[in-house]
Amino acid sequence: MLSLLPTAVQAQDKPLYTVVDGYKVDADTMTGFRTWRAAACDRCHGANQEGMVGPSLISSLKAMSKDEFVKTVRDGRLDKGMQSFGTSKQVMDNIDSLYAYLKGRSDGAITRSKVEPIR
């Protein structure tokens, strides 16, 4: 069954992410997943973004704005053990894609943490 779910929309009316069958995603969202993996965010937030030492991003992104997300990733929360990624070129160059991937997980549109490109 093919189901296309562009659920979150940015201000320009361009979908924040596009998901098919719960795990096939557009190229930008795929870049976000690859950035997640490269930055090893799963060490603290868990392989399924459900939290470990760090909080669940599935829950956090339900209430956190994109601006708050960017600030947290860029500056870290050193008092809580969250490192800063502000000097990571890969993370900062792909922050919008990373947000799209994690927001899709939080919204429930992306139903598993490991995604594949839409073909």
Located regions from the model:
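Gly/Gly-Pro-rich "capping" loops immediately C-terminal to redox-active cysteine motifs
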Residues: 23, 27-34, 46-87
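Bacterial N-terminal signal peptides
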Residues: 1-4
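N-terminal signal peptide c-region/cleavage motif recognized by signal peptidases
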Residues: 6-8
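Short cysteine clusters
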Residues: 41-44
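Flexible coil segments in periplasmic/lumen-exposed cytochrome c-class electron-transfer proteins
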Residues: 12-30, 38-39, 80-119
